[in-house]
Amino acid sequence: MDRYLENIEHKAAVLCDALPYIRDFVNKIIVVEYDCGEWLSGVEEKKLMKDIVLLKSIGVIPIVVHRTPMGVDKFRENKRIAKMLELCGTKALGICGVDVETLHMTISNDYIPVIVPNDIDNEMEYIDPKDTALEIAVKMQADKLIYLSRYPGIYTDET
């Protein structure tokens, strides 16, 4: 019983500490870019989706940009991530590429946009999702841009 009360007290303390930040980010756009499950286990990826849904439920406007692992159909991966968000309790819509009007419409209809970078031909050219996330953050005047990576700090290819 003591452990149960300690757990509740801990959760209450965390929530109290978070309240000022929650207020600061209500109705603010946050773009989150991550490498789809390539370095996250299924359990960790589901926790990430729950965290994104939590952000939305407290009034933050998340936009998700993802990378598709090699050999995986990018449209199928996009649908998978949108479905994961829906299973966590929110509406999500898979979108290809960057179109500000579509993003605004998606957000205004209470959906989380889930974006896969898309080349013009839909096939050949690799587009870095970090570049797409940055482009979206700028065009949507996002308040935060978050890159989730397996690398600590900022990774640069020194080769």
Locate the predicted segments by residue.
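Short internal beta-strands
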Residues: I61-R67, Y147-L148
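Glycine-rich phosphate/pyrophosphate-binding loops
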Residues: L93-C96, M140-E158
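Alpha-helix C-terminal capping segments
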Residues: L54-I58, L87, E135-D143
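Ligand-binding beta-strand-loop-alpha-helix segment within the catalytic cores
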Residues: G71-D119
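Charged helix-capping and loop-helix junction motifs
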Residues: E45-K50, Y126-A133
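N-terminal glycine-/serine-/threonine-rich phosphate-binding loop
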Residues: M1-I63
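Short, active-site-adjacent cap segments at secondary-structure transitions
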Residues: E38-L40, P69-D73, E101, D121, ...
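Catalytic-site beta-strand/loop segments enriched in glycine and acidic/polar residues
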Residues: I29-E33, T106-D131
